[in-house]
Amino acid sequence: MNVVSQDVFKAGSAFSGGVTRHGETCGALLGAIMAIGALMGRERLPDKEQSQKAMVPATRVYDAFKEKIGHTLCSEIHKIRHGKAYRLYIPEEKKAFHDAGGHGPEGCPVVCGTAARIAAEVILDLKESSSK
């Protein structure tokens, strides 16, 4: 399996806070799925077969994340972890999110770590399967 380019990380920079801090799909989940796509996805648009091959492990990541975290939307994850959704694009609410522990031990670091762990497990399973 190829090593993922640093450009992939750069490309995902605006995913935080549920895509540009708007509470949509969790950026950590998107990053985990991007890692699967970077390793297994198609290289050319017409290659639908390869695209479909990436869907199976990407779906595993999505389903496991939703099961462990409780939701895939950043705003809903806020509610689960902090009791309310924060609009992170509003400076006062972003500060309130930080004050509520948004980046503390039970906040985003746990969510990001969970997404990374799930992606790593799926990637290791793929690597093991391909070496058999």
Which residues are covered by each model-predicted region?
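Conserved phosphate/anionic-ligand binding catalytic regions in large, soluble enzymes, centered on
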Residues: 20-34
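A short glycine/serine-rich beta->alpha loop
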Residues: 15-24, 48, 99-106
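C-terminal binding/interaction regions
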Residues: 55-132
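Short amphipathic alpha-helical segments
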Residues: 9-13, 33, 113
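Phosphate-handling active-site elements
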Residues: 1-10, 38-60
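Short glycine/serine- and small hydrophobic-enriched flexible loop segments
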Residues: 34-41, 117-121
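Short, contiguous, pocket-lining structural segments
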Residues: 3, 24, 107, 111
